[in-house]
């Protein structure tokens, strides 16, 4: 779908000086993200910098891909690209240098990201509010997948939420169009995508012909995180991440994942054997809702062919049983400050369970660190 990058629509770019930068709210390999406001209207926006210095052949293809995808996607639960701006160009710049400098993607401003909210102990989600978060997240995934787009970087920091409680999938810097394999020729997408803690087992094993299930695995990790308040599998390496996945989701074998032994890495890596699936058992100390546990379990299925998709997930009993999904606006209205992962203290990592919610008794079985490596 997103093939012809010549059709990217930005024949004229305004200068970014029309916006006043207010604060830095994000940092990554791509550059920086700033909160800003339009100098004339006062409208708040987010400015995402696209670094150009190292591009010897014009505009970076990854940025072109992101822009094209963002222009294609128009949905309430997907971040909205307003325009593209640039730094002021010198009057003496030649045609080559006019393509250099810094480009900014301008987005509608969202007050929070989910990682920032979960980092704040004063932010407490009810089950009904968690249902609303996941319903919006899955609606966004359903829409992008229906439009043949993979996000490829699902994580809590890339889930934005406005002050009015509207969720937006964000950061399409790794996104790409996908298609079914043609003429028995498998796709050869890169598997070096998705932040390690949210990366599904098929990518860790080297799969290059993948599809929407990679994003649903990330959705499952995020859903569990709504209760645990920190990423549930925090590996240090790809091998370690596969070990943690095996300890939570059971040993990776052809019995539970047909043809998994086709992967060269499956033969090379020493993965844990004899591990039983413990998703529900390990999470029940945090997640008291039976339907929620069942949906998380279905999203974290090892075999991508058996993993639930966004349509099935949205029809799950979790969303259609009491309490019904509830608006986030009232809860968020009690918090005046924006919350972003970049501005929050480092989230708990490695060696310890995340803090147990005050109203939940800790399950001794779930804290026996002698039996398993770091998972939650």
UniProtKB/Swiss-Prot annotation:
* Top-level division of the source organism's lineage: Eukaryota
**Enzyme Commission identifier(s):** 2.7.11.22, 2.7.11.23
Annotated stretches, region: Disordered: 345-376
InterPro entries the UniProt entry points to: CDK, Kinase-like_dom_sf, Prot_kinase_dom, Protein_kinase_ATP_BS, Ser/Thr_kinase_AS
Where composition is biased (Low complexity), the residues are 354-369
Q: Which residues form the Protein kinase domain?
A: 19-319
Q: What is this protein called?
A: Cyclin-dependent kinase 9-B
Q: Which organism is it from?
A: Xenopus laevis
Query: Mind giving the lineage of the organism this protein is from?
Result: Eukaryota, Metazoa, Chordata, Craniata, Vertebrata
């Amino acid at each position: 779908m997103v093939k012809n990058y010549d059709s990217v629509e930005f024949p004229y770019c305004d200068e970014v000086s029309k916006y006043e930068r207010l604060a830095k709210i994000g940092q990554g390999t791509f550059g920086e993200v700033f909160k800003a406001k339009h100098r004339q209207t006062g409208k708040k926006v987010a400015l995402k910098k696209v670094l150009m210095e190292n591009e010897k052949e014009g505009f970076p293809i990854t940025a072109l891909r992101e822009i094209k995808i963002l222009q294609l996607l128009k949905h309430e639960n997907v971040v909205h690209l307003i325009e593209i701006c640039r730094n002021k160009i010198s009057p003496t710049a030649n045609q080559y240098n006019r393509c250099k400098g810094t480009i900014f993607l301008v987005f509608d401003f969202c007050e929070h990201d989910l990682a920032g909210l979960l980092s704040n102990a004063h932010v407490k989600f009810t089950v009904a509010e968690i249902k609303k978060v996941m319903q919006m997240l899955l609606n966004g995934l359903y829409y992008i997948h229906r439009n043949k787009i993979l996000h490829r970087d699902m994580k809590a920091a890339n889930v934005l939420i406005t002050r009015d409680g509207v969720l937006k999938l964000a950061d399409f810097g790794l996104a790409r169009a996908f298609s079914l394999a043609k003429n028995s020729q498998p796709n050869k997408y890169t598997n070096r995508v998705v932040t390690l803690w949210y990366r599904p087992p098929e990518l860790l094993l080297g799969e290059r012909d993948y599809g929407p299930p990679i994003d649903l695995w990330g959705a499952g990790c995020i859903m569990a995180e709504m209760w645990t308040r920190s990423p549930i599998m925090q590996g240090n390496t790809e091998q370690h991440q596969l070990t943690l996945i095996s300890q939570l989701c059971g040993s990776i074998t052809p019995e539970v994942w047909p043809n998994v032994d086709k992967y060269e890495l499956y033969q090379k890596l020493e993965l844990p054997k004899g591990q039983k699936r413990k998703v529900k058992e390990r999470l029940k100390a945090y997640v008291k809702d039976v339907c929620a546990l069942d949906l998380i379990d279905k999203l974290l299925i090892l075999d991508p062919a058996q993993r639930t998709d966004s349509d099935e997930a949205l029809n799950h009993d979790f969303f259609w049983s009491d309490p019904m999904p509830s608006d986030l606006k009232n809860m968020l209205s009690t918090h005046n400050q924006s919350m972003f992962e970049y501005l929050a203290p480092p989230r708990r990592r490695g060696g310890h369970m995340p803090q147990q919610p005050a109203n939940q008794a800790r399950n001794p079985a779930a804290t026996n660190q002698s039996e398993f490596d770091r998972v939650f």
